[in-house]
Amino acid sequence: MILRRFKYWLFEYHWLILLILVLVAFILWYWIRDLHYPTFLGSAVGGAIALSYFAMKQHLDEIRLFGELLSKFNTRYNEMNKQLYELRDGLDESREPTSDEKAFLYDYFNLCAEEYLYHRKGFIYPEVWYAWVNGMRIVFVNQQIQKLWYKELDTGSYYGLSRELWAKELETASHFGLKS
């Protein structure tokens, strides 16, 4: 979590770090006589520029990946959307989901877990992830779906997402919009 925040901060302020590093290089070059060589100044400024370029390039690559992931996940969700809400509204306590309905829900759970994995790795922005969590919350109001979801979370097969982590994600998501 701390590294993710640092990464986002670095991406946002890489230009400020560049400015500070170049300023420090010039101050050191000016005040320390042993450093009065153009090679020191060139190396220090070049290194600072390279670091800034790396951060900017990494950010652009991650933005591209984020766009691809967002498109892929939204496409998969859109393909499931109608059936998912029909199931949510039609499945009541009087019956268990059929094997086809369970298979469909497992596909949805896998989509949710994949989204979580990419969020945890820092490739899905928190605002997007928590919007998705709030969307999941709407589906999980159905007690049968929620029961199956918790049973699946207990298996430990969803990329590290557990009941405890899910509860924390729900709590955090409530600060981004929909309250339970």
Give, region by region, the residue ranges found by the protein language model:
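Amphipathic alpha-helical "stem/stalk" segments
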Residues: 2-11, 59-180
